[in-house]
């Protein structure tokens, strides 16, 4: 071991190091650890196409639309407290869609849609009856710009309209903005 550090001082306070901490310092000193980025266990990257599904095990994760092409992501059956945060990291050139698992599931709540190219913004709500089961961002007037974010939270354990609560801010392109919510 190049350095036998046994104690460190942080903001004037001294701390004794145990064997594990000393070994970690030695490993870093010897260049044995390569740090390439943060922990990505809380992130799920979507691929182009309609084969993307999030599961109950993905609850709490950040779900990333990271390809411009059309991408569909289907939600699981709802459970109270289940939460998914969808982020768009690239301007959509095809539809970026979030779909409820069945037509019987649906969204409540709403999002804002802000144009990045014109002084235009508006707020849109899902149908109050919970019938909307799609959120579609095209990269145009209804969101899909890089930086768009949608959070979906399960508010019912039953397969019923209005079992998902939605909030978010979508970035659009153009002089008009339109709703991203639809029934199909």
Language-model segments: residues:
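Extracellular disulfide-bonded cysteine-rich modules/repeats
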Residues: 146-156
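Sequence/structural signature of small/polar-enriched beta-strand/turn repeats
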Residues: 2-4, 88, 112-114, 141-147
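Structured beta-strand segments within beta-sheet-rich domains
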Residues: 121-148
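Exposed extracellular interaction/assembly regions and N-terminal maturation sites
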Residues: 8-15, 21-124, 157-184
